Amino acid sequence: YSAMEEDDCFYGFGEKAGLLNKNKAFLRERATDAMGYDAEKMDTLYKHIPFYIRLRRATRKAVGVYYNNFYESVFNMGCEKSNYWPRYTYWQADGGDIDLFLLAGGSIRRVVDNYTLLTGRPALLPKRALGYQGSSMYYPELEKDSDDAVLDFIDTIKEEGFPIDGFHL
């Protein structure tokens, strides 16, 4: 449990639908194949990362919180109210250790820099990986001719002169 201010901003948590600021959100961390998901309201998608940045709006100061635990878990980012306690957040996991890292920095940029120092930074990708990589849940859900729809889309992109390096379904 952690105390929070009413207007604190919370960013991160991996791939999540909805608003970028997760203040007053309840988030589940688990890897799920979310076919046909709701882009505004659905929670669990493919990439769950138990890391968030809290930005204190009044001071514009940021801190990162990383739980090195990949069991299924939940984050409550102030969506509960108590008659006995001020506003709070909490994290709860189904197992494992509490391996908690608090990442100082003051600004979001510095917190992200410290997070990547801790978790590692990616190597420079090959040029082909930096181009357009298309993906959509739209095509597999078509009632018929989904393969033709994908090929038509790729042909249209090529006709427009837009480079495409891959398309994933």
What kind of feature is each model-predicted range?
Residues 1-129, 133-140, 146-148, 154-159:
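Catalytic and substrate-binding clefts that recognize carbohydrates or anionic sugar/phosphate headgroups
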Residues 163-169:
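Aromatic- and carboxylate-enriched substrate-binding clefts and catalytic-loop regions
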